Amino acid sequence: MKKRDKILQEAKARLVAAFGDKIKDVILFGSRAWGKPHRWSDWDFLVVVRGAYDWQTVRTIRFIMADIDLDFDVFTQTLVVSEMELTNSLRGRQPVFTDAIQNGVYA
């Protein structure tokens, strides 16, 4: 298994272990997903959640991803968005989200 796929699957497994079916998708996007990273490229993740979320949810997700950083010796950047935001808000239409949804690698 590629390192990319291993990290992606592990991230999803840890998030689902913490949040259950509240986690809809974990998507890798950016240079790591599209095969054009350089040595110091970060790992960009979009976590799509079902239902509402708050700052505590975002903090816990980022703590889980920080453990991924340490365990795999990588640097992750993680964005969190809800299904509702993606379909019903201006925030959900931002190019960073639409690009990740359309072109990212799903766990």
Task: Describe the residue ranges of each PLM region.
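Short, aliphatic-rich beta-strand segments
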Residues: 42-48
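Catalytic core of pol beta-like nucleotidyltransferases
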Residues: 1-25, 34-38, 49-107
